[in-house]
Amino acid sequence: MDQPRNPARARLAQGGLALGMGVRFARTAEIARMMRAAGFDWLFIDLEHGPGTLESTAQISCAALDAGIAPLIRVPHGQFAMATRALDGGGWGIIMPHVDTANEARALVDQLKYPPLGHRSIVGGLPHYGFAGVKASDAAATLNAEMLIVAMVETPTAIADADAIAAVPGIDVVMIGTNDLSLEMGIAGDLSHARIVDAYRAVVAACAKHKKWPGMGGVGDLELIRRYVGMGMRFILGGNDTNILAQASAERARALRGLL
């Protein structure tokens, strides 16, 4: 049996941009194939701010595995049981919000990795293998190697500890939650502010030092994304289903109104 591979990790390992699309209000599996056809590498299935359930997450995740796009799930802060259930349902990784310290990053890895790297419990019949029977030792080793653990840094405290967070074995991506960071800094929505730029520099430097991938979310302006990619960002949340649909629909309506 071929070993399952995480397409988002593969894209990052090749030195490319791993492009993600947020899933907030889509609840059916079609979103996975649509976003793969659009050219994205991973889904940001949002259980922190979206109304999705673990059931809908599993359905989307299984469709994503078949389509060749990586399902990554953001759970509410500290919800490790939800995180491991999302992984058992087909997730290729967990995005944990508000990781402020290296100790929190270590706890995250401990809960999400199988032994000997952590203490996650294993179950048979995993979607990553098409529900086929696989030796537990083989599944644990492969999934430990292929999953992505993403620590979101969204406060000045987290930025100050970015080097220590990036140094934690098992953390793959340190991702700036730009909107929340600007809010915490008292500069809400000013995503090009000098303090935000300095935070990006700090995270990029920490990731380069510890051979991790720097990531970003919450930035919609393409030119600003271009600027941060030029600084070294590689794991890019490109938007979410709600905003993309609303914006495209508004543009279409304006164009049609202009016909008369």
Where are the model-predicted features located?
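Glycine-rich beta-to-alpha transition loops that act as phosphate-gripper elements at the mouths
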Residues: 23-27, 74-80, 98-100, 152-157, ...
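Alpha-helix-loop-beta-strand connector modules within alpha/beta enzyme cores
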Residues: 54-88, 112-118, 141-144, 192-215, ...
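Conserved anion-binding
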Residues: 81, 93-169, 178-183
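Conserved beta-strand positions in the central sheet of alpha/beta enzyme cores
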Residues: 20, 43-44, 95-96, 175, ...
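C-terminal helical cap(s) of enzyme catalytic domains, especially alpha/beta-barrels
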Residues: 60, 102-118, 243-260
